[in-house]
């Protein structure tokens, strides 16, 4: 299978409600998102004109408009966290989530959004979201 991957970066802060470790506090990460797609219509010998699965520029535009622009330099907190910390409600760039904004939940959200936005000719085959250099969640 031929797979095309593009890597994206964004900065985001979060906190995990009900967790006893350090991640219960608001803190940020430099996220790295790997998006891998394939075509549902690939010929094993070659790719017909224009010769690529998707233009990297078009993939970048899609990811930036649906994911990066939404989360970059934002604070993402669960409704449960905000219920216990009402003074944060007026923070600029705050995104309220139904669930805890863990790397796993972020990745599942990204999968849902991209699956809905990709054309029928494109198939999402893998996502990897690094929360730190050596810690990440992966969907395959």
Model-identified regions with their sequence ranges:
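Charge-rich, low-complexity N-terminal segments
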Residues: 1-140
């Amino acid at each position: 299978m031929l797979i095309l991957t593009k890597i994206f970066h964004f900065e985001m802060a979060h906190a995990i409600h009900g967790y006893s470790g350090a991640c219960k506090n608001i803190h940020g990460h430099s996220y790295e998102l790997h998006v891998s797609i394939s075509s549902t219509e690939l010929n094993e010998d070659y790719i017909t004109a224009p010769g690529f699965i998707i233009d990297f520029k078009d993939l970048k535009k899609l990811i930036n408009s649906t994911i990066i622009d939404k989360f970059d330099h934002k604070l993402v907190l669960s409704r449960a966290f905000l219920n216990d910390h009402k003074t944060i409600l007026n923070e600029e760039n705050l995104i309220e989530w139904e669930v805890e904004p863990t790397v796993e939940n972020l990745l599942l959200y990204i999968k849902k959004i991209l699956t809905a936005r990709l054309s029928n000719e494109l198939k999402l085959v893998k996502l990897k979201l690094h929360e730190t250099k050596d810690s990440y969640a992966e969907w395959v």
